[in-house]
Amino acid sequence: MDSHQELSAGSPISYDFLDPDWCFKRYLTKDALHSIETGKGAAYFVPDGFTPILIPNSQSYLLDGNSAQLPRPQPISFTLDQCKVPGYILKSLRKDTTSTERTPRPPNAFILYRKEKHATLLKSNPSINNSQVSKLVGEMWRNESKEVRMRYFKMSEFYKAQHQKMYPGYKYQPRKNKVKR
């Protein structure tokens, strides 16, 4: 029987999925994750020593009534650590559950200056984009007097001290550069 043919009421259950060339073989790869994320599939973790029985929705009526009497499995809870899960699925699941917020760095003198000047530049030039604002603020910073720049350096020292009190064990750890292709 062709697995793509329409089934009639007395049709036997197709066991095409036991064939190594079965069309759903592709779901054993990363494509499965996309199907799960888009709601076109689901992930079930099968513990070692168990074999899942997959029955297409079009054939599930064969299990109703007095036909094939399969024992109804009872749900069992497992933690992810107890299951053999493909790495690409486990990695994406752990991202959601273990996402920790990074401690913000204390602002330096230029950041404080830029924050203040950014708003005033946007008020005076509403059509200006962020790239142009950055260039203008950088130019303005280089042309500022030592007194003005010292004021911002003192402000940054104050923020650094506040940051030290809030996060006593903080140590700046820059992110590693990813390899460019």
From Swiss-Prot:
DNA-binding region(s) in UniProt: 103-171
Keyword Transcription: yes
InterPro entries, alphabetized: HMG_box_dom, HMG_box_dom_sf, SRY-related_HMG-box_TF-like
Lineage, highest ranks first: Eukaryota, Fungi, Dikarya, Ascomycota, Taphrinomycotina
Keyword annotations from UniProtKB, A to Z: Cytoplasm, Cytoskeleton, DNA-binding, Nucleus, Stress response, Transcription, Transcription regulation
Name assigned to this protein: Mating-type M-specific polypeptide Mc
Expression triggers: By nitrogen starvation.
Keyword Transcription regulation among record annotations: yes
Physiological role: Mating type proteins are sequence specific DNA-binding proteins that act as master switches in yeast differentiation by controlling gene expression in a cell type-specific fashion. Positive regulator of MFM genes. The HMG box recognizes the DNA sequence 5'-AACAAAG-3'. Required for conjugation and efficient meiosis.
Pfam families per UniProt: HMG_box
Transmembrane segments: none
Database matches in PROSITE patterns: HMG_BOX_2 (PS50118)
Note: There are three genetic loci for mating type genes in S.pombe, mat1, mat2-P and mat3-M. Cell type is determined by the alternate allele present in mat1, either P (plus) in a h+ or M (minus) in a h- cell. Mat2-P and mat3-M serve as donor of information that is transposed to mat1 during a switch of mating type.
Compartments where located: Nucleus; Cytoplasm, Cytoskeleton, Microtubule organizing center, Spindle pole body
Protein's organism: Schizosaccharomyces pombe (strain 972 / ATCC 24843)
GO cellular component: chromatin; cytoplasm; nucleus; RNA polymerase II transcription regulator complex; spindle pole body
GO terms under biological process: cell differentiation; induction of conjugation with cellular fusion; mating type determination; positive regulation of induction of conjugation with cellular fusion; positive regulation of meiotic cell cycle; positive regulation of transcription by RNA polymerase II
Domain of life: Eukaryota
One annotated GO molecular function: RNA polymerase II cis-regulatory region sequence-specific DNA binding
Coiled coil spans: none
